[in-house]
Regions:
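Core catalytic lobe of class I
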Residues: 1-6, 10-207
């Protein structure tokens, strides 16, 4: 799935690089044995694999493989993720739903299904005279063991903040919003986006 990427980066709690380390982020190829070393204890995998649609990612990625070869590659990578994962871990896969359906037995061979999340985005391309415009992808959430969930850390604003019950939650209990739905509307990262970097198919920062 590409050549080895740059060195990992580390995230620390607090404003400096001397605080408690809370995250280690790796970039690049999942085939790098140092990234997916068995027993490494990784807590979360956030993946956006090539979709095998013939997209030009550059010379390091083959995005047009025979379907069986592609499915086997995906199985091998996510099996390696499982072996490198902590006893309680999350795996998120961003992909198109029809392709995830084809690979379902492979994806859930070791990992356990947890939730199906839909990422919807406005799109002015891909229109068809035979079907509705495709303007969404799936974020498949798989788990190993029983990872902790901190849903209260990412919330959406209340839709009726003037309601008496909601006002109490806001002003007396300090709540700033309610739980997210299992569908998220997030714009694509385009060439004019503020968070755009030198990458051919970048996932929007808000989604991450």
């Amino acid at each position: 799935m590409g050549v080895k990427g740059r060195e990992p980066s580390f995230v620390h709690h607090g404003s400096s690089d001397e605080g408690e380390p809370v995250g280690e982020f790796h970039y690049g190829s999942a085939s790098d044995p140092q990234v997916l070393e068995p027993g490494k204890g990784i807590k979360t995998f956030l993946t956006d694999p090539p979709y095998n649609l013939g997209f030009d990612y550059g010379p390091e990625v083959d995005d047009k493989q025979p379907e069986e070869d592609y499915h086997q590659m995906m199985e091998d990578v996510f099996d390696a993720c499982y072996e490198a994962a902590d006893d309680d871990a999350n795996l998120f896969i961003i992909h198109y739903p029809q392709d995830l359906a084809k690979m379902w037995p492979r994806l859930t061979k070791k990992w356990k299904f947890h939730q199906w999340i839909t990422w919807a985005y406005p799109a002015n391309f891909g229109h068809s005279s035979k079907r509705w415009t495709n303007a969404s992808r799936t974020i498949l959430w798989l788990v190993k063991g029983e990872p902790e969930f901190y849903g209260e850390r990412v919330v959406q604003p209340y839709r009726n903040p003037t309601d008496k019950r909601i006002r109490k939650l806001i002003h007396e209990e300090g709540n700033i919003g309610t739980s997210l739905y299992n569908w998220w509307v997030v714009n694509l990262c385009k060439n004019v986006s503020k968070d755009k970097r030198d990458y051919s198919n970048q996932i929007p920062e808000e989604l991450l």
